[in-house]
Design a protein with these regions (language model features):
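Residue-level preference for the first positions of well-ordered beta-strands
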Residues: 75-77, 152-158, 187
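Cofactor-binding loop segments of dinucleotide-utilizing enzymes, especially the Rossmann-like FAD-
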Residues: 105, 160, 193-194
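Soluble extracytoplasmic domains of inner/organellar membrane proteins
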Residues: 142-146, 155, 160-165
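C-terminal alpha-helix
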Residues: 237, 241-249
């Protein structure tokens, strides 16, 4: 518990002082002075903080990470399961091509030091996660899918939308995947991570984060469905493959 608490305090200071202040005094001015390099600057910033977060977790909390497989240095669609608050830096660290747009819950648009401003800066699509998409949400997802189709961005999506209590893969919320798969003919990869079900929330991380062993497997590439009529069957296949991979991780 002590090491977990120490990491949490250090990381909160990092979010507030390093990430948050750095965005104000370094990243925003750099984008203002060189707007044509916005994507490259945001990509470098996201990747730096993702890797730094994982290094801090290893050094201060003894977290171990074992990864099998990798993602290509090109625009792609990455479908990842959702177990903990560490999923996003973990997913970002694996994407080596154009930085990924991440469909994000609207409540995270503001209120989280460092992270909320960065999500806005990176132009992530914000969603209410209701059954029916509002018009602005549909427009933002469509725009994100079109950027992926052009090869300007990747997409990192957590289609469960919520973390389950036992870390198993829940039902997929399909709107984001349907739109992306229908508009972006890019290779699809699945990332399955396990070992984080006990740190679902920041409160869990405060007392139980230390000595976590995270295991990750990358599946794919998968070719996109040939037409819109096959999109739902393709999503079902991804869910089945990811569930089987998680079961295999837990048996090994």
């Amino acid at each position: 518990m002590l090491r977990s608490g120490i990491f949490f305090v250090i990381y909160f200071c990092y979010l507030t002082l390093i990430m948050g202040l750095g965005q104000r005094v370094l990243l925003w001015p750099a984008i203002f002075l060189a707007p044509q390099r916005r994507r490259a600057l945001v990509r470098a910033w996201l990747r730096f903080h993702a890797l730094t977060t994982l290094r801090m977790a290893r050094v201060f909390a003894g977290v171990r990470l074992t990864t099998h497989g990798s993602l290509p240095a090109e625009s792609c669609i990455v479908v990842m399961n959702h177990q903990s608050v560490l999923d996003i830096p973990l997913g970002l660290s694996l994407v080596t091509g154009p930085y990924p747009l991440i469909p994000t819950r609207d409540r995270y648009r503001r209120g989280i030091p460092g992270i909320s401003p960065l999500a806005r800066l990176a132009r992530f699509p914000f969603l209410s996660q209701k059954r029916t998409l509002a018009r602005p949400e549909l427009a933002s997802l469509t725009d994100a899918a079109d950027q992926v189709a052009r090869g300007d961005q990747s997409l990192l999506i957590f289609p469960e939308g919520h973390r389950t209590d036992d870390g198993r893969i829940g039902r997929f919320m399909r709107n984001g995947l349907r739109i992306t798969l229908a508009r972006a003919s890019r290779p699809i990869y699945c990332v399955v991570a396990d070992g984080m079900a006990h740190i679902r929330t920041f409160a869990d991380s405060f007392v139980r984060f230390a000595d976590t062993h995270i295991r990750v497997v990358v599946l794919g590439p998968f070719d996109p469905p040939s037409d819109d009529a096959h999109v739902d069957a393709f999503i079902d296949m991804l869910h089945q493959r990811m569930t089987a991979a998680l079961d295999q991780l837990r048996r090994s």
